Swiss-Prot record:
Belongs to the universal ribosomal protein uL16 family. GO terms for molecular function: rRNA binding; structural constituent of ribosome; tRNA binding. Binds 23S rRNA and is also seen to make contacts with the A and possibly P site tRNAs. The keyword Ribonucleoprotein applies. InterPro entries: Ribosomal_uL16, Ribosomal_uL16_bact-type, Ribosomal_uL16_CS, Ribosomal_uL16_dom, Ribosomal_uL16_sf. Keywords: Ribonucleoprotein, Ribosomal protein, RNA-binding, rRNA-binding, tRNA-binding. PROSITE patterns: RIBOSOMAL_L16_1, RIBOSOMAL_L16_2. HAMAP family: Ribosomal_uL16. Part of the 50S ribosomal subunit. It comes from Methylocella silvestris (strain DSM 15510 / CIP 108128 / LMG 27833 / NCIMB 13906 / BL2). The keyword RNA-binding applies. This is Large ribosomal subunit protein uL16. It comes from the Bacteria.
Length: 137
């Protein structure tokens, strides 16, 4: 699963996601993409599950680009522990995704196969998404 090799700080503030994506809202690599329509924190496990669903459906054909990287440590206190006594230990890694952000890109497969693959990936994510396609000139 994706996670940073090293970080400046062990724990991070919870943070909020305000407004639309300030970058990464256009297709850069592939012909097709999956765009987020809602703000949400997406975990490394969810990204990996979506990637596996796509690659299996495409039968390893084409190319997949993951445009998001989980760089925010999410801490969690153990179960049945009383409140207080400090912040919990880092449990997982997540990425804050703003609306409009392109999360995955595909290339080298037909449009119908790409749409199905990205729809399967979308089912693994906790947000509403949209299939987008590069305009042919």
């Amino acid at each position: 699963m994706l996670q940073p090799k090293r970080t400046k700080f062990r724990k991070a503030f919870k943070g909020r996601i305000h407004g639309a994506a300030k970058g990464g809202f256009e297709l850069s690599f592939g012909q097709f993409g999956l765009k987020a329509l809602e703000p949400e924190r997406i975990t490394a496990r969810q990204i990996e599950a979506a990637r596996r669903a796509m690659t299996r459906h495409m039968k390893r054909a084409g190319r997949v680009w993951i445009r998001i990287f989980p760089d925010v440590p999410v801490s969690k206190k153990p179960t049945e522990v009383r409140m207080g006594k400090g912040k919990g230990a880092p449990e997982l890694w997540a990425v804050r995704v703003a609306p409009g952000r392109i999360m995955f890109e595909l290339d080298g497969v037909p449009v119908d196969l790409a749409r199905e693959a990205l729809q399967l990936a979308s089912a693994k994510l906790p947000i509403k998404t949209r299939f987008i396609q590069r305009i042919q000139e």
